[in-house]
Amino acid sequence: MAVGKNKGLAKSGKKGLKKKIVDPFTRKDWYDVKAPSLFTNRDIGKTLVNRTAGTKIASDSLKGRVFEVSLADLQGESEAERSFRKFRLIAEEVQGRYLLTNFHGMDFTTDKLRSLVKKWQTLIECSVDVKTTDSYLLRVFCIGFTQKDQRSQRKTCYAQHTQVRAIRKKMTEIITKEISSGDLKEAVSKLIPDSIAKDIEKSCHSIYPIHEVYIRKVKVLKKPKFDMGKLLDMHGEGAVTKRVTTEDGTGVVISRPEGYEPPIQESV
């Protein structure tokens, strides 16, 4: 047995003492995520990012992040009536400590979608590619089910193939008409109460009674060139109003978006 000090262990011990444990969160900042003004609850959460260091700018890392939020949370509803609908919001601009988002899609939760499918009825689906007036290309998916007549003694309520085609055609026409007639802001405002699905249900009743009609999914396929003015228009109701007193004592009300930072002056 060798007697003496183990030089390797002694060296490794010294190196271990010199190491400093640095908390990674000391190099990060929190940013507030703001939803468009179409929704009741605009503060949807916070996100973390590394501070600007060298060529790595914090705002560049934040842009493009996608947040998925339940409609019940966006509308501030405690009931679970609309919690199965999820809106996707994408970060497009950073103003101060605020992250301004825009609509990036909509989807259903898997459990809700699976619960709709039942026996003894016909499932009718359609998908349409529609362009809004401000050049957003959306792919809209619609779903509906045939409804049993209360007076009928039959167990099933299957629709004929010609009726399914007629209903699908009517779905396509209504979706195209409603989405293409306005910009993205108007399209989102129609998706929140699902008014398009209600119109489809009423219009298709003459062909075959249907129920549980939903716009189940929306994808943003193409976007126009980024326009700061239109993004601020989506967040228009979130402007901060301040009262400034002039030299003669009169007050002037000014309106600025949340997170506004004044430009740097070249000279004073």
Swiss-Prot record:
The keyword Repressor does not apply. GO terms for molecular function: structural constituent of ribosome. Keywords: Cytoplasm, Ribonucleoprotein, Ribosomal protein. It holds the Pfam family Ribosomal_S3Ae. It is found in: Cytoplasm. One of its GO terms (biological process) is translation. InterPro entries: Ribosomal_eS1, Ribosomal_eS1_CS, Ribosomal_eS1_euk. PANTHER family: 40S RIBOSOMAL PROTEIN S3A. Component of the small ribosomal subunit. Mature ribosomes consist of a small (40S) and a large (60S) subunit. The 40S subunit contains about 33 different proteins and 1 molecule of RNA (18S). The 60S subunit contains about 49 different proteins and 3 molecules of RNA (28S, 5.8S and 5S). Belongs to the eukaryotic ribosomal protein eS1 family. This is Small ribosomal subunit protein eS1. It comes from Artemia franciscana.
